[in-house]
Amino acid sequence: MQSSPLLENLIEHLRCLPGVGPKSAQRMAYHLLQRDRSGGMNLAGALTEAMSKIGHCTHCRTFTEEESCAICNNPRRQNSGFLCVVEQPSDIPAIEQTGQFSGRYFVLMGHLSPLDGIGPKEIGLDLLQKRLQHESFYEVILATNPTVEGEATANYIAEMCFQHNIKVSRIAHGIPIGGELETVDGTTLSHSLIGRREIQL
């Protein structure tokens, strides 16, 4: 038990970060208080500003402080005819770093998981349906994670695209099965994009 309630509170809240356990949270808290109080204040300010000002792009649903993100506002992207569907906002910079894609995105904010109560509406597939109806796409690239849930989600979206006569492809499985897209190295992800395959019924 810590002697300071404020210190206990800080450690407890640092544990909300992914991969941070009690010991790591304790080290962070002591480091900020002992060696970098100004850094801690800057971190607190940045967190407060980000939490209050960053929302979702009205088109692709990634994070942005504007109504539309920079990618969706890019005329070259708007006229590309390509839409890449990903599970998380963090997947976009991973794909962008490959330099192999210059189209637009749609972020699901998850994947289908009926056992957890996550259906099509919970991951924004009603919004994706509207985009497929009202925007012109030559090809939809499905870049969901190569997990059971990711594959099920990709198949569901493929059916939606077939209804609109839109070509559908799935990124190649150079990515390890069960892996997360944002943790894959750039070379592997680049080859996966180049070697994507069309889905056919």
UniProtKB/Swiss-Prot annotation:
Give GO terms: molecular function aspect only.
Answer: DNA binding; zinc ion binding
Alphabetized Pfam families for the sequence:
RecR_C, RecR_HhH, RecR_ZnF, Toprim_4
Note the superkingdom of the native organism.
Answer: Bacteria
Q: Where are the zinc fingers (C4-type)?
A: 57-72
What region holds the Toprim domain?
81-176
Which keywords describe this protein according to UniProt?
Answer: DNA damage, DNA recombination, DNA repair, Metal-binding, Zinc, Zinc-finger
Supply the InterPro entries for this chain.
DNA_Rcmb_RecR, Rcmb_RecR, Rcmb_RecR_Znf, TOPRIM_dom, TOPRIM_RecR
| UniProt GO BP | DNA recombination; DNA repair
HAMAP family xrefs: RecR
Record-linked NCBIfam families: recR
- Outline what the protein does: May play a role in DNA repair. It seems to be involved in an RecBC-independent recombinational process of DNA repair. It may act with RecF and RecO.
Q: Which family does it belong to?
A: Belongs to the RecR family.
What is this protein's record name?
Recombination protein RecR
Report the source organism: Histophilus somni (strain 129Pt) (Haemophilus somnus)
Recorded name of the encoding gene: recR
